[in-house]
Amino acid sequence: MKRRDVLSLLVLGSLIWVAGTILYAYRANVIFETTSSRYWWAFATSPVFSAILCVVILRRRRIPLAHWASAMLLLAIPGMLGEAVVLSNLSTFMPRLHAASGGPYGAFLFTTYALVLALAEIVTLRAQSSVQNTAQSRSAG
C-alpha cells in the first residue's frame, strides 16, 4: 500500500469517527433509551452500513484485496482509540446518554468494529489464497 493511502485511510477513519461521535452525542438516547426494537434495529443495521461505507472507501481508493485487512485497520484504529476516550468519559462526550447505557453503546461499537474487520480479513485471506493457487498452478504446469 502506498504511503498516501495509509495517510488518507487514517484521516478518513478519523473523520468518520468524529462524524459518528457527533451524531451519537445528539441521537444516542433515541436509539439506546427508547424501545428495545429500535435498539436491536440499529444494532443490526449500523454495522452493516459501516461495513458498506468502508468497502466503498476501499474500492474507490483501489486498495488491492490482499491489503484490505490492513487498510480496514487503518480506517478503524482512529475510531477505536477515540471510543476508548469517549467510553471512559461518557458523560462528557455523550451528555444525553445515561451512564447505564454505556454498556449497550460499547456492545454496539464492538459489534460494528468486529464485523468490519472480519469482513476485511475474509476478503484478504481469499485474495491471498487465490494468488497462491494461481502460483501453484503455474509452477505445476
Give names to the regions the model predicted.
Residues 1-33:
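N-terminal signal-anchor transmembrane alpha-helix
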Residues 19, 40-58, 80-83, 111-115:
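Core segments of alpha-helical transmembrane spans in multipass integral membrane proteins
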Residues 31-52, 68-73:
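Loop-to-helix transition at the N-terminal end of transmembrane alpha-helices
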Residues 33-41, 96-106:
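Non-cytosolic membrane-interface motifs at loop->transmembrane helix junctions
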Residues 60-77:
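Loop-to-transmembrane helix junctions at the membrane interface
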Residues 75-98, 115-119:
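C-terminal halves and exits of single transmembrane alpha-helices
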Residues 111-131:
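Membrane-water interface at the C-terminal end of transmembrane alpha helices
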Residues 129-141:
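Short, highly charged, low-complexity non-transmembrane loops/tails of multi-pass membrane proteins
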